[in-house]
């Protein structure tokens, strides 16, 4: 409750137009979250401009869905940290881009350091994650996860289904993306055994 009512998005409603901005609304929401029969609602699709001039789609969840995701995130976060690649720095607690830069400095200042750096982006990473893979590998209530993944999104009063991807803007989406990418560093080390890695974050 505190996370979704005190962050920057607390005044941004989802498709239902609701925000929890009074003690009464918060108390009612707590009661509703304890009830059975939870159903995720579609996301409200908006677009934000990227630095390159292109627009990135962002999914705005309802306050109730945000609260449910925040609840499950309490359990998912520790698992994701245990499974995380050692040089993964994006979307992780107590880690930031500055840590990735420090890792780069550490390995490049050696006498035997590599003479080049390879930088790459995973195109549309969040949008292309397999729902089947998430349902098979993410350790949480599968029914709840499926409801989030298949909630769809509303754009100009039209409901669009979601067959793949983790919605950008969802509280759990960064952790789902990290769980999906775990093991990438190991695969790269196997293919390029002499390389040293620093993985800031995936790009959309």
Q: What are these model-predicted stretches?
A:
Residues 1-27:
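Non-catalytic, polymerase-adjacent accessory regions of viral genome-replication enzymes
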Residues 15, 74, 120-122:
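Residues immediately flanking
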Residues 2-9, 74-90:
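Charged boundary/loop elements
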């Amino acid at each position: 409750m505190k996370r979704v009512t005190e962050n920057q998005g607390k005044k941004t409603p989802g498709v239902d137009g609701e925000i929890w901005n009074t003690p009464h609304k918060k108390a009612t929401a707590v009661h509703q979250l304890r009830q059975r029969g939870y159903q995720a609602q579609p996301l409200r699709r908006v677009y934000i401009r990227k630095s390159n001039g292109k627009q990135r789609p962002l999914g705005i969840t309802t306050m109730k869905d945000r609260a449910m995701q925040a609840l499950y995130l309490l359990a998912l976060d520790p698992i994701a940290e245990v499974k995380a690649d050692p040089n993964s720095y994006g979307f992780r607690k107590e880690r930031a881009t500055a840590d990735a830069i420090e890792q780069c400095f550490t390995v490049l200042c050696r006498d035997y350091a590599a003479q080049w750096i390879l930088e790459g982006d995973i195109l549309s990473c969040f949008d292309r994650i397999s729902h089947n893979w998430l349902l098979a590998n993410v350790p949480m209530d599968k029914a709840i996860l499926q409801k989030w993944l298949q909630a769809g999104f509303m754009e100009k009063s039209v409901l669009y289904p979601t067959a793949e991807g983790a919605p950008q803007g969802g509280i759990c989406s960064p952790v789902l993306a990290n769980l999906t990418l775990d093991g990438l560093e190991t695969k790269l080390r196997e293919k390029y055994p002499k390389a040293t890695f620093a993985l800031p974050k995936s790009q959309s």
